[in-house]
């Protein structure tokens, strides 16, 4: 599912809301998650999961084409850990 499909689905399930308002809400939620992570904060959506940022240390890598050793800089990467309810639902344990 892509963002526009998510917006469409929410609009269909909430006919009292205009689609442009749903789009604004969805975009705001995503922006707030991104902003919080950029500040180094953890975003927890209870039952769904938690978004956080992990630091990957600098290291020596290898160019797969040439075999040459290359230096890979330290970087921060987004990380998502699923919540218990999401894991249970995906594994059919909530029935």
UniProtKB/Swiss-Prot annotation:
SMART domains the record matches: BHL
UniProt keyword DNA-binding present: yes
CDD domains: IHF_B
Example of a GO biological process term: regulation of translation
Annotated GO MF terms: DNA binding; structural constituent of chromatin
Keywords on record: DNA recombination, DNA-binding, Transcription, Transcription regulation, Translation regulation
Pfam families reported in the protein's UniProt record: Bac_DNA_binding (PF00216)
InterPro entries: Hist_DNA-bd, Histone-like_DNA-bd_CS, IHF-like_DNA-bd_dom_sf, IHF_beta
Origin: domain of life: Bacteria
Gene3D superfamilies (alphabetical): IHF-like DNA-binding proteins
GO CC entries: chromosome; cytosol
Family listed: Belongs to the bacterial histone-like protein family.
Subunit organization: Heterodimer of an alpha and a beta chain.
Family annotation (PANTHER family): DNA-BINDING PROTEIN HU (PTHR33175), INTEGRATION HOST FACTOR SUBUNIT BETA (PTHR33175:SF5)
Job of this protein: This protein is one of the two subunits of integration host factor, a specific DNA-binding protein that functions in genetic recombination as well as in transcriptional and translational control.
HAMAP family attached to this UniProt entry: IHF_beta
Name of this protein: Integration host factor subunit beta
The species this protein was found in: Paracoccus denitrificans (strain Pd 1222)
């Amino acid at each position: 599912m892509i963002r526009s499909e998510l917006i469409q689905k929410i609009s269909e399930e909430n006919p009292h809301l205009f689609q442009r308002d749903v789009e604004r809400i969805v975009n705001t939620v995503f922006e707030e998650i991104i902003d919080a992570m950029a500040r180094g904060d953890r975003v927890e959506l209870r039952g769904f999961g938690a978004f956080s940022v992990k630091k990957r240390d600098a290291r020596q890598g290898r160019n797969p084409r040439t075999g040459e050793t290359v230096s890979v800089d330290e970087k921060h990467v987004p990380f998502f850990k699923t919540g218990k309810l999401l894991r249970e639902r995906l594994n059919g344990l909530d029935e």
